[in-house]
Amino acid sequence: MSFEVFEKLEVKVQQAIDTITLLQMEIEELKEKNNTLTQEVQDAAGSREALVRENEQLKQEQHVWQDRLRALLGKMEEV
């Protein structure tokens, strides 16, 4: 009787070990995915900052061209 109980206990312990091993593997996979996603977020933030700077530069250039165009139109009206 005690041998059967020991065998059942051994099976349960082995199942617990297998479950723990699988969960550890899953945790490692999730950590890798998390690291990848963190890097993607950082890259996207950097790209966004670059686009914001470029947008500001283009707005400034647009204002310069608008001012030049207004000046040119003003000269044409004078003539």
From Swiss-Prot:
The primary site where this protein sits is cytoplasm
Which superkingdom does the taxonomy of this entry point to? Answer: Bacteria
- Name the UniProt key words of this record, in alphabetical order: Cell cycle, Cell division, Coiled coil, Cytoplasm, Septation
What does UniProt give as GO cellular component?
cytoplasm
Q: Which GO terms describe its biological process?
A: division septum assembly; FtsZ-dependent cytokinesis
What Pfam families does the entry give?
ZapB
- Where in this chain does the entry annotate a coiled-coil region? 6-78
Give the subcellular location: Cytoplasm
UniProt-listed InterPro entries: Cell_div_ZapB (IPR009252)
Q: Which family does it belong to?
A: Belongs to the ZapB family.
What the protein does?
Non-essential, abundant cell division factor that is required for proper Z-ring formation. It is recruited early to the divisome by direct interaction with FtsZ, stimulating Z-ring assembly and thereby promoting cell division earlier in the cell cycle. Its recruitment to the Z-ring requires functional FtsA or ZipA.
Quaternary structure (record):
Homodimer. The ends of the coiled-coil dimer bind to each other, forming polymers. Interacts with FtsZ.
Query: Would you tell me the protein name for this molecule?
Result: Cell division protein ZapB
